[in-house]
From Swiss-Prot:
Self-association and partners: Forms a cyclic heterotetrameric complex composed of two molecules of XerC and two molecules of XerD.
Gene Ontology CC terms, in alphabetical order: cytoplasm
Name of this chain's protein: Tyrosine recombinase XerC
Cited Pfam families: Phage_int_SAM_1 (PF02899), Phage_integrase (PF00589)
Domain (Core-binding (CB)): residue spans on this chain: 11-97
Every Tyr recombinase domain range: 118-298
Subcellular location: Cytoplasm
Superkingdom of origin organism: Bacteria
GO term, biological process aspect, one: cell division
Length: 310
């Protein structure tokens, strides 16, 4: 059966859609914009069903849903649009299950690919050195330098930096206890410069910290510093130190990852340091250029080296 978008759908496909649209209007309270999106996506999918010769929604299985998602990807559909398509389909099938017209939701296990977020450009080593040339005696300046040294020296997330307590820091061994995503604990080493400046900060921290405050880094009020304050202070130091790039905590972490991977070519070690559960996250996060990839290959692959100087 061949149809066009203007071909009327059989009642067995159209009537359930109309009942669902009424359900969205009267009971779900969705906005008109969302209702229009759902209707557009479901009408398109109904046309696909008709083109395949299917006459009832109960004939849809997970394979068809995956095929539909794959078709959208091949046609260049945005991840957000594909997510809307699958979401509308899941909601519709849940509605049919509620009415006893289907026994299972074939769209339940199918998900849209995650929308790729552009990674920030990392700082080069000279920019990092320029940023960290902070040599002021003011306790807040010492704190800020210690924060930046620790973030770049250990590759911390912003939330991890803020959550560090004094008891988590082992200056003698240069080791830090970190609570990462999902409350997963890891221990990471940190640089000699971070050790030096965290030590300096600990010597003046008592001038600011409220009695009994466990946080390593505190605000002028004496309590744990906020995420926003860290972001603001780092951006200000970037301007004060005349660094061309905008400075953010994530950019320092990204720079740590990139510089570590460029110098070591050890993806697994960098994964552990960053606290990534999957190594694929590390591969995306630390964008090696082809030169570094080729260098890593030449050094590691047993058949990459030429024999007898050839």
């Amino acid at each position: 059966m061949t149809t066009t978008p203007n071909t009327p759908l059989p009642n067995s496909l159209q009537k359930p859609l109309e009942r669902f649209y009424e359900f969205l209007r009267s009971e779900k309270g969705l906005s008109l914009h969302t209702q229009r999106n759902y209707k557009q996506q479901l009408e398109t999918m109904a046309q696909h069903l008709a083109e395949m010769g299917l006459k009832d929604w109960s004939q849809v299985d997970a394979g068809w849903v995956r095929q539909l998602a794959g078709k959208g990807m091949r046609e260049g559909m945005k991840a957000s649009s594909l997510a809307t398509r699958l979401s509308s389909l899941r909601s519709f099938f849940d509605f049919l299950i509620l009415r006893g017209e289907m026994s299972a939701n074939p769209a339940k296990g199918v998900s849209a690919p995650r929308k790729k977020r552009p990674l920030p450009k990392n700082l080069d080593v000279d920019e990092v050195n320029q940023l960290l040339e902070v040599n002021e005696d003011d306790p807040l300046a010492i704190r800020d330098r210690a924060m930046m040294e620790l973030m770049y020296g250990a590759g911390l997330r912003l939330a991890e930096l803020v959550s560090v307590d004094v008891r988590d820091v082992q200056l003698r061994s240069g080791e830090l206890r970190v609570i990462g995503k999902g409350d997963k604990e890891r221990k990471v080493p940190f640089s000699g410069m971070a050790t030096e400046w965290v030590g300096k900060w600990l010597r003046v921290r008592g001038d600011l910290a409220a009695p009994g405050e466990p946080a390593l880094f505190v605000s002028k009020l004496g309590t744990r510093i906020s995420h926003r304050s860290v972001q603001k202070r780092m951006a200000e130091w970037g301007q004060k130190q005349s660094v061309a790039s905008h400075i953010s905590p994530h950019k320092l972490r990204h720079s740590f990852a990139t510089h570590m991977l460029e110098s070591s070519n050890n993806l697994r070690a960098v994964q552990e340091l960053l606290g990534h559960e999957n190594i694929s996250t590390t591969q995306i996060y630390t964008h090696l250029d082809f030169q570094h990839l080729a260098q890593a290959y030449d050094q590691a692959h047993p058949r990459a080296r030429k024999k007898n100087g050839e």
